[in-house]
Regions:
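Acidic, polar-rich low-complexity tracts and alpha-helical solenoid repeat scaffolds
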Residues: 1-172
Length: 172
């Protein structure tokens, strides 16, 4: 890349480097060095060659990496949670929400935060987080579970599969 900056296919060179780094990313429980390197290269493709197929594919791969990192935070949080190390678990769950807000793991992370707050006796914090969960994910199974641990059993006419939660504002 350094020696051929003016080449008409330089975008492809950057893309190949990013894909190579992406393929070296390992499982959720492994070291993040390769992951961060892949993120850097993928972002470089996205920023330098926006609007290209390379940038589009790099964006998809970057999203997958972010989901993987969020999953790792969640797994570590559960590890601490299972050992009743609630503050360490809370930090990991909050990291999922703050660092990976577009990941598929935010719903569960919010629910786990509620669990921690309930375990610590922080009822108002649990309710506030449940409001956030319900606002952002009103039809989520995690929202129904949150309702049950904060407020008790769901009303009979409300079911996770059957709906009704959109009309229910249990935390308001």
């Amino acid at each position: 890349i350094r020696d051929h900056r003016g080449h008409p296919d330089i975008a492809y060179g950057y893309y190949l480097r990013a894909v190579s780094a992406y393929r070296s990313v390992s499982e959720v429980d492994k070291d993040e060095g390769d992951t961060r390197k892949a993120e850097t290269f993928l972002l470089e493709v996205i920023n330098k060659f926006s609007g290209t197929d390379y940038a589009l594919d790099a964006s998809v791969k970057l999203n997958a990496i972010k989901n993987q990192r969020a999953a790792k935070e969640l797994v570590i949080g559960k590890f601490y949670h299972d050992r009743k190390e609630f503050l360490a678990a809370l930090t990991r769950y909050q990291n999922v929400v703050s660092e990976f807000p577009d990941s598929t793991y935010v719903e569960e992370a919010l629910y786990r935060i509620i669990e921690v707050y309930v375990s610590l006796g922080l009822t108002q914090e649990a309710r506030n987080t449940a409001v956030l969960l319900g606002h952002n994910f009103p039809a989520s199974t995690w929202y129904f579970k949150a309702y049950e641990i904060v407020e008790g059993p769901l009303p009979r006419h409300i079911t996770p599969k059957g709906g009704g939660i959109g009309r229910l504002n249990p935390f308001g």
